[in-house]
Amino acid sequence: MPKIKTHRGAAKRFSKTGTGKIKRSHAFTSHILTSKTRKNKRNLRKGAIVEAVDHKNIAKLIPYM
């Protein structure tokens, strides 16, 4: 069997932690920021962990990370 290819778009958007969880960044941070509060923009800078229902599908896209 050949190796599974890594989905390059997913590889740029997600990374794995040391414990095997998948990290992601928040959306809504690139433009139209004037209507968002300072607190909202600050919280959007923080990373987030992928939810359990999505973990299996994303893990298939990035098998070697």
Swiss-Prot record:
Any one of the GO CC terms: cytosolic large ribosomal subunit
GO molecular function list: structural constituent of ribosome
UniProt keyword terms in alphabetical order: Ribonucleoprotein, Ribosomal protein
Pfam families named among the record's database cross-references: Ribosomal_L35p
GO biological process: translation
Listed InterPro entries: Ribosomal_bL35, Ribosomal_bL35-like, Ribosomal_bL35_CS, Ribosomal_bL35_sf
Annotated spans, Disordered: 1-41
Ranges of compositional bias, category Basic residues: 1-26
Domain of life, per lineage: Bacteria
Family per record: Belongs to the bacterial ribosomal protein bL35 family.
Alphabetical list of NCBIfam families matching this protein: rpmI_bact
Name of the protein in question: Large ribosomal subunit protein bL35
Protein source organism: Geotalea daltonii (strain DSM 22248 / JCM 15807 / FRC-32) (Geobacter daltonii)
